[in-house]
């Protein structure tokens, strides 16, 4: 309890002390994969202002990435666009807490105590939430509660059917988890590729396959739930100009898969634009090619 209170106090102090990240220039280069050309950051923002959903794929815990996310959203504000901010980093069951904070009914300290923020919330996501609060924009707690994801990863998708009716509303109604290209990427990331005796990657055991399948179901459940949250937020805008800007780990939206594919399934005909932020060591040696051209509509390179 003492440790929890100390951590909360520390996060509150950090949130209060953190300067708006947009105040500093962030080295970056933007590549438009549709035109095959580098463009300036503001040209990208102008294009995003015309979208109905923008999915921003981030590398977690990268400071410049988070500054660019803030710059992107504040750029929409400069264009007199009032977006909805949607975050992977908050779970559906704390939506009421978020709403109470945005309305001024609770303090920042209470938000941190009740909303289970990520450890780097003060520096990485608080600026986005504070901007939304000051402008009166909605903030969507988009993700599946992590305790449900953990149970799915442990016991499989059957655990979803054992949820109470109230808890079931916190998980997407329509759940699809096909073994497609996204599954192949997920499996590649999950599987131990240590070589066998002949130097080739060792084939996964049945147990490893079963474990991967359970973890993939947890991943799909997150993607489906975030996509459903995004679709609901988009429909709630009732035709008002400007996008739902959803921030998630890049794996969830790169290559139009995961949350991106599931959002498009729910919003056919809507303009869904994907941004992928990529920290690199050298901005002067960029030559996007191959799979990177399929990764997103806009590639935003920044310095690690």
Please tell me what each predicted stretch does.
Residues 7-51:
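N- or domain-start disorder-to-order transition segments that initiate the globular core
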Residues 225-245, 250-304:
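C-terminal regions of proteins
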Residues 59-63, 90-94, 145-149, 250-254, ...:
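Solvent-exposed loop/turn segments at secondary-structure junctions
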Residues 96-233:
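A substrate-binding/cap region within the structured catalytic cores of diverse enzymes
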